[in-house]
Structures are given as structure tokens and as C-alpha cells.
């Protein structure tokens, strides 16, 4: 992608964020701008504090079914993955996609999976409902297959098959020196830590208090002071997720088309 094209895309994103932030609450802090991917492939953009104030776009230039998306901290661009393993950049304003690479190892998770960039290593993590655990260089598609997901021997859920529906990393900013990886288990309705990520070892944090469907979105927003905030979206509802306990609190219904949410991400320029 040419530098001029990227610059224009970032300008459009900045204008969208600024415009929608004006409609947010006057709390002294701007509301994070989010984009959700629906099960039928639509993009819904909205502020976290007012999820009903949404704009919907249909992606163009993407071949196949999108199964997840995330903003890459290293460059601020939004990336999407298709069921065929193709990686695209996606303009969150126009929803136009541009092919970047293709995974060298097939990912079998489909939309029942988690997808998020590790901000420290600049690699895209993919975790599937079947326990698959991949690490991707999105620039060339080079994919490493790490150890399958499993609960730690000392965890109360050791021996249970994890059914991971979404994943997210803390310290979600460029150049992060440290990060933690969290997953949502839809079989047990839990928030769990994946520690260490490459080993696929899961450790229970706590119950969400709500049912997590097999298709869900999860994002961790890091503000300018380094504070991490968990946000999850499923069944057309946005939730705050306490990363210390797992407790989920509803923030309201997401506007736009009803149905499943399969991905959630911030937009570049959000706090």
C-alpha cells in the first residue's frame, strides 16, 4: 500500500473518530471508537459509551468470508482474516479491503475463534474453538503452529476442552514492552489468561456472569495512562469486562443489524 494512500486513510479515520467522539459523554475522556464484525460480514462502527449510535458498512474488495478483525498497534491499520486464510487491510470508514498476505498454515477455527495482535512482538495470534493456536506475520503470511490450548494442570478446569470464542492482549499500543493475553471460553463462560501464549496454557481468571456464545468479539483498550479496559461484544450487546475478576457489565445494545458478533476492535485514533 502506498504511503499517500495510508495517509489519506488515516485522515478519514481521524475525522470519523473526531466526529463521533463529539456525540460521546462529557466525562473528560473520549469514548473509545470500536468496529464490530457481524456473522454476515458487515462492519458496525460505534463509540463504546453509546453502542446504539452506530454506522454500518459492507466490506468491498474482500474475497470470501471475514471471520475476525483487529487493529495492528504497530501501524494503526485494521486487518481482517477470511475463512480461506487471506489477510486484508480494511478501511473502517469506506470498508474497502486490500489483500496483504495468505497464511502458510490453514486455520480451522472459522468464526468460532479469537484473533488479536500481540503489541510486543507484532504478530497476529489466532486461537480456535478446536484448540488451534497460531502466530502469524501478516506482512508475508508466515505462520507458526504453537502448542494447542489446554488448561494448566493446577487449574480447576484442567482436563476440560477449552472452547475459545475471542482473545485480546493488554497494553494494546505500539512498542509495548509487556503484555498479557486474555481469552473468552464460551463452554465455561469464563475469562481466562493464556500464559504463556505460545504454550497455549490457560489459567482461569473468573466467571463472566453472562453466557458467551461460540461467536464473540473481545478487545482491550489501553488509554494514555496505560490503563487497560476489557470490552466484549456478543448477541448484539457490548460489555465491560473486569480483567481482574472476569465480571461482565452490559453497556447496551449495539446499533445496526441484529445477530452474531464475530470480531471487535478499536479504530486508530481511539484513546
Go through the PLM ranges and name each one.
Residues 48-51, 91-95, 138-141, 196-198, ...:
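Short loop/turn segments that connect beta-strands within beta-propeller blades
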Residues 30-49:
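An edge-strand/N-cap motif at the start of beta-rich repeat modules
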Residues 67-75, 106-122, 159-177, 214-226, ...:
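Structural signature of eukaryotic scaffold interfaces centered on beta-propeller domains
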Residues 33-37, 77-80, 123-126, 176, ...:
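Conserved beta-propeller blade signature
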Residues 14-23:
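Bacterial N-terminal signal peptides
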Residues 52-61, 96-106, 145-157, 201-210, ...:
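A short beta-strand motif characteristic of beta-propeller blades
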Residues 243, 247-271:
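Blade-level signature of beta-propeller repeat domains, shared across WD40, Kelch, NHL, RCC1
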Residues 40-44, 84-88, 130-133, 188-190, ...:
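Loop/turn residues immediately N-terminal
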Amino acid at each position: 500500500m502506498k504511503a499517500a494512500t495510508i495517509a489519506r486513510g488515516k485522515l478519514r479515520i481521524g475525522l470519523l473518530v473526531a466526529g463521533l467522539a463529539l456525540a460521546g459523554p462529557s466525562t473528560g475522556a473520549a469514548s473509545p471508537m470500536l468496529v464490530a464484525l457481524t456473522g454476515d460480514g458487515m462492519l458496525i462502527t460505534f463509540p463504546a459509551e453509546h453502542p446504539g449510535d452506530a454506522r454500518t458498512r459492507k466490506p468491498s474488495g474482500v474475497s470470501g468470508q471475514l471471520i475476525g478483525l483487529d487493529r495492528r498497534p504497530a501501524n494503526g491499520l485494521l486487518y481482517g482474516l477470511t475463512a480461506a486464510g487471506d489477510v486484508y487491510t480494511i478501511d473502517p470508514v469506506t470498508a474497502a479491503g486490500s489483500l496483504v498476505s495468505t497464511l502458510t498454515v490453514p486455520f480451522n477455527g472459522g468464526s468460532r475463534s479469537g484473533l488479536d495482535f500481540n503489541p510486543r512482538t507484532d504478530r497476529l495470534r489466532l486461537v480456535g474453538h478446536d484448540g488451534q493456536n497460531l502466530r502469524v506475520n501478516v506482512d508475508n503470511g508466515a505462520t507458526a503452529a504453537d502448542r494447542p490450548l489446554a488448561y494448566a494442570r493446577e487449574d480447576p478446569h484442567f482436563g476440560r476442552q477449552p472452547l475459545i470464542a475471542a482473545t485480546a492482549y493488554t497494553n494494546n499500543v505500539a512498542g509495548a514492552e509487556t503484555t498479557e493475553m486474555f481469552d473468552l471460553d464460551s463452554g465455561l463462560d469464563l475469562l481466562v489468561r493464556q500464559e504463556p501464549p505460545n504454550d497455549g496454557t490457560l489459567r482461569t481468571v473468573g466467571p463472566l456472569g453472562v453466557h458467551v456464545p461460540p461467536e464473540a468479539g473481545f478487545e482491550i483498550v489501553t488509554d494514555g495512562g496505560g490503563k487497560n479496559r476489557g470490552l466484549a461484544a456478543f448477541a448484539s450487546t457490548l460489555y465491560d469486562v473486569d480483567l481482574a475478576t472476569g465480571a461482565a457489565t452490559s453497556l447496551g445494545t449495539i446499533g445496526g443489524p441484529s445477530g452474531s458478533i464475530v470480531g471487535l476492535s478499536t479504530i486508530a485514533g481511539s484513546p
